[in-house]
Amino acid sequence: MGATAVSVGALGGGKAIGQAKKPIPKDPLKIAAVSFLTGAAAAPFGIPGDNTFKMCADVINKEGGILGRKIELMSKDEAGGVDAQVKLARKLILEDKVDADLGYISSASCLAVLPLSDETGGLIVAYDCGTHELMEGTKSPYEVPKFKLGFRSSAHLGIDNIGLALFIKKYYPKIKTIAGVNPDYAWGRDSWLIFEVAMKKLMPQVQVVKTLWPPLGNTDYTAHISALMGAEPDIVHSSLWGGDAVTFTKQALGMGFFKKIKMAYSRGEPYPQEVGKDYPEEQIICCAGTHYFLFNPPDKTSSGLQKWFVAEYHKRYGKYPTYPCYHAYQAIYAYKNAVEKAAKTAGGWPTIDEIAKAMTRLTFPSPSGPITIREDHNAIEDVLVGFSKLTPKYPFPILDPKRMEVFPAPRVNAPVGTRTVDWINSWK
């Protein structure tokens, strides 16, 4: 891994060795890791994310910790709704005195919890939630950052839905109709909004023939599947996730849906592994970045991390890492790299404000490639899109290696201070 601890004496910043301005505490670092550990989102999202937090903390501790301080990881369940998460975040920061709160898969959780960073004075890093509204202002241009102590260490849903639109334009330039089935809350509404705006800009001839909004946690999609089949769109966009995506896929298989209609899944990368060999081929799948266990990053450092990460995760948990795993890695290593960067200037253990300053404009290596957190406190990433394809080597479809597209970060991330929708509408 190469995560090297930095000694106190090496942090003097011009001072004599051993004369650190700020002593490094000897007690462990208390880091909260909040993911869905129960419920429909646990198996495909929360548990893989939590497993990765545990794996990374274990590796960091074996390598000496962060500036010599071992991590005491506090895994917490995101289940229970928004009010429960607000209460939990307050407790973690104000009572448990965590050094950092890393977490949150649900966009609703993030929208409620991240404002608590500045209110409580605690560092909160959102690791997986996708709504673009989390860090954007109400109109362009807007001031950044929205939160002084709040960050997101992964890109927002803009990359997924813009990436899908770019992919569809390349591979299906003659389609005429699309439809959507998305969960009826911020994540689903925002995902469809960005996809629809991008499609109108890139392929203005395409018409929307059906939009459906099942509730989060729905267990019966037969009516939705029938309605989509009746509308006969060329492609159906979906941001269904977790157990909802698995349930929809299995019910759609039983109704012959995929024999007639192609799906374009925003952040659909985990589901072939979850469903198994029955997962349909030729479906369009986005990876929430370049978070895919067979992706080989072009730079040597990231490529080495990817090989280690995939092998280590598979050895520990018997599965291949999916994108929530990569997002968890990014959160804990964003914190580690920010602390080490801040310590060089602080001359010892940095304050929360100093860590936040160091995390702003931070670039650090990851298994998917270098990650940059911009001055708006949001990470930007490239995005990978491909087609599902069965092969003899794996018991589930992989992405067809001959038809994968990586769209670079500048093509799928709006500039700092510009709302994503406004940016798309400005395309020439």
Feature annotation, model-predicted:
Residues 131, 252-329, 341-346, 388, ...:
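Extracellular/periplasmic periplasmic-binding protein-like sensory domains
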Residues 1-18:
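N-terminal export signals
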Residues 13, 17-33, 65-70, 169-176:
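Immediate post-signal peptide segment of exported/extracytoplasmic ligand-binding proteins
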Residues 67, 340-357:
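Short, charged, surface-exposed loops that flank catalytic or proteolytic processing sites
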Residues 20-22, 44-49, 64-139, 153, ...:
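Beta-alpha junction/loop-to-helix N-cap segments that form part of ligand/metal-binding clefts
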Residues 23-25, 32-54, 76-83, 105-106, ...:
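Extracytoplasmic "Venus flytrap"
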Residues 24, 50-73, 200-206:
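Signal peptide-proximal N-terminal region
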